[in-house]
Amino acid sequence: MGTFAVTGSASGMGNAVVQRLREQGHHVIGIDIKAADIVADLSTPAGRRGAGADVLAACAGRLDGAVLAAGLGPIPGAERVITEVNYFGVVELLQAWRPALAATDRAKVVVFASNSTTTVPAVPGRAIRALLAGDADKALRAYRMFGRYGPPVAYAASKIAVCRWVRHNAVTEQWAGAGIRLNALAPGAIMTPMLEEQLATPSEAKAVREFPVPIGGFGDAGQLADWVIFMLSDSADFLCGSLVFVDGGSDAYFRPDDWPRAVPARRLAAYLRRTRQFRSFERSRP
């Protein structure tokens, strides 16, 4: 059996993943702001450093996988906390845990993204670029023009940025070359305590209920956990740098023609250059 770290372990989708893993006999190290094996506030640099170090101590330097499920929704006035938890609370922990993941040679990582990555309009590219550059303050300045709509934009930007980080890093020697499979899962509206709170808030409930979901209703946290278990399994060895949507069809409804998309002619030279430069990381593995 393996050892797995799961953030957001105390409730919602993270807790459902913890239950599934423990049912299979795995050792799970849960991380959350309360009621967890490791209690940490991922909205602060100190909290993230502490969580990173505590997990490494608890796993004795070896992790078979990690699930980054901790996240905050579009809470009014919480742009900074959303940014810190949803982006830096993923990236900084994974950077800290990478040696432990590499030690097992076949580790799997699942990052919880969101279908907000493709269904929230007008997310400023400069905010995404700022996050990828590690500049939270610059990203926050980009949200000011949105006023009361700042939190949804901050939420979407944090999820887009973390997906970009996953896709850029998943195919590098440090990750793929170390045998680590790094992927992201993009849920839609899943019935969790966070969604229940939104549905109980009159100012938010109408928008949540009216948001287009072609198959109707809301997703089930247990079913999402089953997706995660698959992505952590040996069956997902060939899954690398992927973003998987599990959202009842919302992404397809809004953007049926946006992707897949062929490489445009203007990028052909760069495409051919990358093709010539490619070297498989398999040869560097034992």
Predicted stretch roles:
Residues 92, 154-155, 160, 184, ...:
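C-terminal helical subdomain
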Residues 37, 82-83:
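A hydrophobic alpha-helix adjacent to the NAD(P)-binding/active-site core of NAD(P)-dependent oxidoreductases
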Residues 72-76, 102-177, 189-190:
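Catalytic loop of short-chain dehydrogenase/reductase
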Residues 51, 93-101, 165-166, 227, ...:
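Hydrophobic positions on the long internal alpha-helix
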Residues 31-50, 55, 71-72:
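Rossmann-fold cofactor-recognition segment
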